[in-house]
């Protein structure tokens, strides 16, 4: 039996995105702190809203302190759906782990990045309950 299946669908393909939304109990849309990412997330938010699919946004690759991140968070919350409180930072541990075919949870389980991933997972699980 499978408890979770993650589908990584491109935001630019309306058909793929619609199929992924239909199959999901919850859609997580990662957004980097950039206006382009926010604008690219609008079609996904519109599809989710039109079909009444649950949607949450996760800020990803965030710098430690940047006003732009807060502005993008505000913009994401205005698109509809839920804005997850945890943020995943831009961490070297993620890239280094990927080079080994692993995750930061495996290579650096006590790192800030691993803690951020655990916090995001906990927030997602809470939405699914």
What are these regions (language model features)?
Residues 39-60:
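Conserved C-terminal guanine-recognition region of P-loop GTPase G domains, centered on the G4
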Residues 7, 29, 57-59:
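Structural beta-sheet core signal
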Residues 1-5, 23, 126:
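Catalytic phosphate/metal-binding cores of nucleic-acid and nucleotide-processing enzymes, i.e., regions
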Residues 63, 73-102:
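Beta-strand-loop-alpha "switch" segments that mediate conformational coupling across diverse proteins
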Residues 10, 21-42, 63-65:
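Conserved Switch II/interswitch segment of TRAFAC-class P-loop GTPases
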Residues 98-116:
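C-terminal boundary of histidine-terminating zinc-finger modules
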Residues 1-17, 31:
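Switch II (G3) loop of P-loop NTPases
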């Amino acid at each position: 039996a499978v408890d979770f299946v993650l589908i990584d669908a491109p935001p630019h393909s309306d058909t793929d995105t619609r199929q992924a939304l239909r199959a999901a109990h919850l859609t997580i849309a990662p957004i980097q702190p950039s206006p382009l990412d926010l604008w690219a997330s609008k079609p996904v938010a519109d599809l989710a809203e039109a079909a009444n699919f649950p949607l949450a946004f996760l800020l990803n690759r965030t710098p430690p302190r940047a006003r732009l991140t807060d502005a993008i968070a505000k913009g994401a919350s205005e698109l509809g759906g839920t804005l997850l409180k945890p943020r995943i930072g831009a961490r070297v541990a993620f890239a280094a782990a990927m080079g080994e075919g692993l995750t930061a949870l495996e290579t650096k389980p006590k790192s800030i990045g691993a803690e951020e991933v655990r916090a995001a997972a906990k927030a997602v699980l809470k939405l699914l309950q």
